[in-house]
Amino acid sequence: MLAQSHPEAILNTALHALAHEADWRAILDELPAPIYTTDAEGAVTYWNRACVALAGREPELGRDRWCVTWRIYTTAGDFMPHEQCPMAEAIKEQRIVRDSVAIAERPDGSRVAFRPYPTPLFDEAGTMTGAVNMLIDVTEEQSAVLLEQADRCRRLAGALYSRESNIVLKTMADGFERTAAGLKPDNDV
C-alpha cells in the first residue's frame, strides 16, 4: 500500500500544498492517506475523503476536536481521551509528534490501528496557526505485534511456578489476543 510505504512523502506533499497552493483542499483530497487539519485550538477544520474510510464516520467540522476518529485506545487497549491523543499533544506542545500507534474505534464497533503524524503549522512570524495530521493504517502490523506479545506471555507463564504470575500473564495474553482479533484493516485506504 502506497500510504504505508511512503508516509513521509505523502505528508510532505500535504505540507507543501498547505503552504503554497491556493487550492490545497483539492490536492489533499487526492492523497491516498487520511489527512485532516485543525485550528490552533484543535478544532477540526478540514478532512479528506480517506478520513471517512478510516474513521468510519464523517467528522464534524468545528465540533470535533483533536481527532477525526470516534474513540481512541492505546495499543494496550486502554481508552485514550481525545485531549490526550498525539494530535492534542502536538498542538498543546507546538511540536511534531512521531513514533506512536493508537487504535481507533469506529461507530460500528470495529477497530483499526493507525500511526499518526501530527504536525503543527506556523505562519511566517512563527505563530502556530493550526496543525495537520496524517493517519496511516497499521492494523495488520499491530495485530501481528499483539499476537506476538500474547505468545510471549503464554510462554513466560508456562515457565514460571508462581500461580499468581501465571494468572496475570494469561490474562494479559487473553487481552492481547482480544485486541488483535478486534482490529479490522481498512482496505479502502
Residue positions per predicted region:
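Terminal output helix/cap of sensory domains in signal transduction proteins
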Residues: 59-108
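PAS-family sensory domains
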Residues: 5, 86, 105, 116-119, 126-138
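PAS/PAS-like sensory domains across diverse signaling proteins
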Residues: 41-43, 53
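N-terminal capping loop/helix in small sensory signaling domains highlighted by a polar->aromatic N-x2-3-F motif
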Residues: 48-52
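Sensory modules in modular signal-transduction proteins
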Residues: 15-38
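Conserved hydrophobic beta-strand signature of PAS-family and PAS-like sensory domains
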Residues: 35, 44-45
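PAS/PAC sensory module
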Residues: 99-103, 110-116, 132
